[in-house]
Amino acid sequence: FYHPEKYFLPEEVVIKPTIGELFDEFLNKHPLSEVRKKNFRVVKRALLRYELYVRATKRGQKGFILDVDLVTPDTLRDMWDFFQNEYQYYELYPSIYEAIPEKRTPQPRSKNTLIDCFSRIRTFFLWCFDNKRTTNRPFDKFPIEECTYGTPYYITLEERDRIFNADLSATPQLAIQRDIFIFQTLIGCRVSDLYRMTKLNVVNEAIEYIPKKTKEGNPVTVRVPLNDKAKEILERYKEYEGKLLPFISEQKYNDAIKKIFKLAGVDRIVTILDPLTHNEIKRPIYEVASSHLARRTFIGNIYKKVKDPNLVSALSGHKEGSKAFRRYRDIDEEMKKDLVKLLD
C-alpha cells in the first residue's frame, strides 16, 4: 500500500520525445509541400546544433536538452543570437557540424532569413500546443517582426524587347537562356514551376500549371494564354525533347541572365535593400538580375496596365491577399503621377 511504484505497470512509463522526434512527427502530420518541408528541415538541423552548442559552451550545461516544455522567451533570444552568428561558430566548433552537417558552409543570415526561421519555429510550437504535445507558448512573449522588402524593381517592356532582340549569335548558349528568360517574363511563373514544365503544359495555346508553392493549401490551376512572342519562342525549340525548353541549373541560369543583361546594354541603376544591413544601395540592374526578375516583370507590367490585383494574381498564381503581391502596389511612379493628375 505504501509502495505505489510496485503497482506502476511498465507500459505506463512515458518516454518523452526529443525535440528532433517531435519535429519529425510535425513534418509527417502537418500538411506541407515538399519545398516547405525542406525549409523546415534546415531549421530542425539548426535547432539540434543549438542544443550541441549550449552543451559545448555554457558552464554546467553539458547535459542540456532543448525541451519544448521549458523553452522561454529568453531561450528564444539566445537561439536568435545563435542563428545570427552561426556562420562564425562553424569554424570554432567543427565537431557540431560533423555531428549535424549542412551541404553549404553557413553564411551570415539576413534579418529576413532570421524572421523566416523563427516563424517556422513558431509554427512548430503552435502545432505542439494544438496537438497537446506541450502547454508551453513561448512565442506569446516573443513577437516576431514582419520581413522588410524594398519596392520590387522590374524591367520595362522596352528593356525586355532590347534583350529579346539583342544579337547574341557569338554566344549561342546565352541566346538559349535569353529565350527562356523572355518566355518566363511572358508567363510570370516562379522558376521552380518553369523547370517542371514539359510540352504537356501547353494546352489550347496557353500554359497550364499548378504552382508548387500553393499546392499544399488548395491547389489552383493557373492558365496563362501565350502571346505571339511566347509562341515564337516555343516554335524555336519544338524539336527539343523532354522538358518544355533547354533548362540548365538554376544557379547557371541566374549567372547567364546577368551576362545577357550586360550584353544587351540593360544597365540602369536600381535601388535595392542590402539583405544584411537593410540599408538602401544602388546597383546596375545587370548585377542583381535573376530569374525572379522575370516573374516581377510579368506582374509589374501587367499591374501597371490593369491595376486589378485579383486579375493579375489569377495569372501570377499568387494567393489572394498575398503579402508579396501587396508590394506591387507602391511600384510605379507613372501610376502615381496618373493618379495625382486626376486632381488637376
Model feature map: region roles:
Residues K111, L168-I182, K305:
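Conserved catalytic core of the tyrosine transesterase superfamily
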Residues L126-N136, Q184-A206:
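Short, charged phosphate-coordinating catalytic segments
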Residues S169-T171, E239-K243, K258-A314, H318:
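Short, basic (Lys/Arg/His-rich) helix/loop patches that form interaction surfaces
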